[in-house]
Structure formats: C-alpha cells, structure tokens
Design a protein with these regions (language model features):
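Conserved small/polar residues in nucleotide/adenosyl-binding loops
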Residues: 159-161
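Charged, glycine-rich intrinsically disordered N-terminal tails and low-complexity linkers that flank
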Residues: 1-12
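Residue patterns forming the tRNA-binding/recognition surfaces of aminoacyl-tRNA synthetases
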Residues: 138-152
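Residue-level preference for nonpolar/small residues embedded in alpha-helices
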Residues: 13-14, 82
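Nucleic-acid nuclease catalytic cores
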Residues: 7, 23-48, 52-137
Length: 161
C-alpha cells in the first residue's frame, strides 16, 4: 500500500529532520509520545512530532514532513495547505501560538518555517470538525461525497486497474 510506504518513510526520516532542524536553528526539539486532547472538545486531538521551546521560552509545536520531488512545487510558495490546516488544528488542540514545520523535499532539500496561530481559521476548522463528529461519527453516517480533490483522489484509489 502506497500510503503505508509513505508513512513508513516519514517515520524513518522524522528523527533526521528533527536533528537537522536543531542543527540549523539551535533550538531544542523534545519528542512528544502522547496524544494531546482539546480541553473543550475531547474528540479533537493532536499527535505532534515534537515540542520546541523558542528563544523567548515559549513552547511551540514541531512538525516534520517529507515530500517527494514531484510535490516540490507545492513548497515553492510556502507550506502546502493541508499542512497549514493540520498545524492550525494542532495549535488549537494544544493551546499554543506558534509552530515550526520542517520538511525534507525530494530527499535533498531541507526547508523550515514558522506558522503562527490563526484564530479565525481555527474557528472555521472547529465548526467543521464538530459538524463532522456530530453528523457523521456519532450517527455512523458516511460523509457526503463532494467534488473536492481529496474525494476524487480517494475514489480513484478504489479503482484497481
């Protein structure tokens, strides 16, 4: 399964990406080995790759990513949208204001950046996540099929040619 292979290599590379981030920034990343749950919405949780204490002593999220060379263009103008949304979700769950995201692209290009908390985006995410939890998970109802790229990719993955 391609997803499992991608996940496997992401897990293998995570400590290497974390170490390179620490080498380049001088910041210490502490691994986090526990799920973190939102205080108000216990069905919202985060599994962060690490916690960074920045130069001002503020605790921040650390996320490590790997990307194939085929997806390098998605990193040209910043962080791809799906990772921005993931990090904003994590910031909401953890109650933090900042995250560092580091990526190894194509196996030979290292990038990192800061993502700051966006409360208006977080509000939108929580509304959607609450809606999904109440309307789909609690009622055991499959979500409505839409015309999003993610849905199209999923449906195509079901076809074995």
């Amino acid at each position: 399964d391609n997803g499992n292979e991608l996940t496997y290599w992401g897990n293998v590379m995570e400590p290497i990406i974390r170490k390179e981030f620490m080498n380049r920034t001088g910041l210490k990343v502490r691994q986090k080995h526990a799920m973190i749950f939102h205080e108000e919405y216990p069905y919202l949780f985060a599994d962060v790759d690490g916690i960074v204490t920045d130069e001002r002593g503020e605790k921040c999220i650390f996320e490590a990513k790997t990307a194939s060379q085929y997806k390098a263009d998605q990193w040209e103008n910043g962080v791809p949208e799906e990772y921005v949304l993931q990090v904003q979700h994590y910031l909401a769950v953890c109650g933090m204001n900042k995250a560092y995201i580091a990526a190894l692209i194509g196996g030979n290009k290292f990038v990192f950046t800061i993502i700051y908390r966006d409360d208006s985006l977080i509000e939108e995410l929580i509304v959607k996540e609450k809606e999904f939890w109440e309307e789909c998970v609690l009622t055991d109802t499959e979500p409505v099929v839409d015309d999003s790229e993610a849905t199209q990719e999923y449906l195509l993955s079901l076809i074995h040619i």
